[in-house]
């Protein structure tokens, strides 16, 4: 069972949570540190905290033990209107937005892929794809110090988009549909770690939407100077589904050799 998490300070997350609560109904509940808590009619916890979502490293301490992982309803800040899904972590020496340096949160490839595919279908049905890019993001920000996997689903990129009823409806419908139908039927032709590409990784996103791939952590070109064998091993170890492939996208020779050595060490397919 997953738990739906949001920050009460976040207009995108809290607005989407309100719609989910209206559509599914449920009973009020109480959990430590939670400012809002609903046990939805489908048995899923919908929980809001005062802390910003990037600082939720305490989730394992306050959520019931039978929760398998977390889906965070969140805003996204960036350049253009987007509907995004990503894993969290700090693949480098700095952690300005939550979590710890050199630390990756547990990844949930099957859930991330299922959410992205459903998000695109819903966005198409609602007529949003002409305005919004539906995309994965590379791994970034906190929280990182969790034992169970976490996936962020987001509305971007400014307050104008965060508060729109249609974007919140799209996120809410995506999550509800995923829980009702797609959670048990997500297929992964490959489970991959992604290396290279931009922060909004076109190649890796296409692999999910068009080729049936599911992704663990994605290391964008902006963090490749920090990439080490230890980070790749951490991504491998902290992935709920078994990784079988490393996908490269326009990486320098040093990184290509590092990826090759990593893939050979763990018996993974290397795809360029």
From Swiss-Prot:
The lineage of its organism: Archaea, Thermoproteota, Thermoprotei, Desulfurococcales, Pyrodictiaceae. Its cofactor is Zn(2+). This is D-aminoacyl-tRNA deacylase. Its EC number is 3.1.1.96. It comes from the Archaea. Gene3D superfamilies: AF0625-like. D-aminoacyl-tRNA deacylase with broad substrate specificity. By recycling D-aminoacyl-tRNA to D-amino acids and free tRNA molecules, this enzyme counteracts the toxicity associated with the formation of D-aminoacyl-tRNA entities in vivo. The keyword Transcription regulation does not apply. GO terms for biological process: D-amino acid catabolic process. The gene is dtdA. Keywords: Hydrolase, Metal-binding, Zinc. Monomer.
């Amino acid at each position: 069972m997953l738990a739906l998490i949001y920050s009460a300070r976040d207009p995108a997350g809290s607005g989407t949570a309100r719609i989910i609560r209206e559509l599914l109904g449920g009973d009020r509940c109480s959990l430590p540190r939670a400012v809002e808590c609903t046990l939805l009619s489908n048995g899923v916890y919908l929980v809001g905290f005062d802390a910003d979502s990037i600082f939720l490293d305490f989730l394992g301490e306050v959520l019931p033990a039978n929760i398998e992982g977390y889906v965070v309803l969140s805003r996204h800040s960036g350049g253009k209107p987007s509907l995004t899904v990503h894993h969290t972590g700090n693949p480098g020496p700095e952690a300005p937005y939550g979590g710890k340096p050199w630390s990756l949160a547990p990844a949930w490839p099957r859930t991330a892929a299922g959410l992205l595919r459903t998000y695109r279908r819903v966005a198409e049905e609602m007529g949003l794809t002409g305005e919004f890019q539906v995309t994965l993001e590379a791994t970034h920000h906190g929280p990182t110090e969790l034992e169970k996997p976490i996936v962020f689903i987001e509305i971007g990129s400014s307050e104008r988009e965060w508060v729109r009823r249609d974007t919140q409806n799209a996120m809410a419908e995506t999550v509800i549909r995923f829980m009702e139908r797609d959670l048990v039927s997500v297929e992964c032709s490959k489970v991959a770690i992604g290396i290279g590409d931009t922060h909004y990784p076109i190649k890796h996103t296409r692999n999910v939407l068009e080729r049936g791939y599911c992704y663990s952590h994605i290391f964008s070109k902006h963090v490749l100077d920090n990439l080490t064998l230890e980070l790749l091993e951490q991504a491998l170890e902290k992935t709920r589904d078994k990784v079988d492939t490393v996908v490269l996208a326009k990486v320098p020779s040093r990184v290509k050799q590092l990826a090759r050595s990593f893939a050979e060490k763990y018996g993974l397919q290397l795809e360029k």
